[in-house]
Amino acid sequence: MPLPKISEARELSDEKLSDEIVAIKRQLFQLRLQKATRQLEKPHQFRQARHRLAQLLTLETERKRAASQSAKEEK
């Protein structure tokens, strides 16, 4: 399975974006538990989850900066 594209994440609403971030963090936690108990079957999922989390956090930061920038311009 290829790594997800950030263009797919850009289509998400702010609420969906936050939900997705929480879901990915939970997934990473579960993967770490599986790794610790030696039950992890697909180690490539770590990379995919971290990559997706980085994309989503980057997008969230971009949106927050854009919102604060537009708020400054309105003053």
From Swiss-Prot:
One of its GO terms (biological process) is translation. Belongs to the universal ribosomal protein uL29 family. Pfam families: Ribosomal_L29 (PF00831). It comes from Nostoc punctiforme (strain ATCC 29133 / PCC 73102). Coiled coil: none annotated. PROSITE patterns: RIBOSOMAL_L29 (PS00579). One of its GO terms (molecular function) is structural constituent of ribosome. This is Large ribosomal subunit protein uL29. One of its GO terms (cellular component) is cytosolic large ribosomal subunit. Keywords: Ribonucleoprotein, Ribosomal protein.
